[in-house]
Design a protein with these regions (language model features):
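Signal-transduction coiled-coil helices of two-component systems
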Residues: 59-62, 81, 93
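Helix-loop segments that flank and shape redox-cofactor active sites
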Residues: 54-68
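Conserved catalytic core of two-component sensor histidine kinases, primarily the HATPase_c ATP-binding
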Residues: 31
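An anion-binding catalytic pocket shared by soluble metabolic enzymes
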Residues: 74
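Amphipathic, coiled-coil-like alpha-helical segments
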Residues: 1-28, 39, 43-54, 77-89, ...
Length: 122
């Protein structure tokens, strides 16, 4: 009988290694939303990146009301494609439109998602 401490049951790198970082896009969610249509996935992701970059470029110069509207639209689009971290931070930005720290974090997440989508689209 094997002991759970055997190498076959231990984590590569030991117990101290953390969980793998989550992908910026939940690809299983996206596949469900697009009924596993890969062409539709690419199209939806392309449209999402365009919208997200547009929000990123406009949100810092917008007033509080405009920031709320931009963040709200981004939140819904992000949930639709499975970009849950962007959706979460967009919701925070919607609730606190004057918090520049939130807006910068959101911009960073948008860059990560853009880069992730570019990498999977190769």
């Amino acid at each position: 009988m094997f002991d759970q401490d055997d190498a076959a049951f231990s984590r590569p790198g030991g117990e101290a290694c953390g969980a793998a970082p989550a992908r910026p896009i939940d690809l299983a969610h996206l596949a469900r939303q697009t009924m596993d249509d890969r062409d539709l996935e690419r199209e939806v992701l392309s449209l999402f990146v365009q919208q997200a970059l547009s929000v990123r470029d406009k949100i810092l110069d917008a007033d509080a009301t405009q920031r709320r509207a931009l963040a709200h639209g981004l939140k819904g689009a992000a949930r639709g494609v499975g970009a849950m971290a962007i959706a979460e931070w967009a919701e925070r930005a919607e609730e606190h439109p004057q918090d520049l720290r939130l807006l910068r974090r959101l911009a960073g997440l948008i860059r990560q998602v853009r880069d992730f989508i570019a990498a999977i689209d190769r």
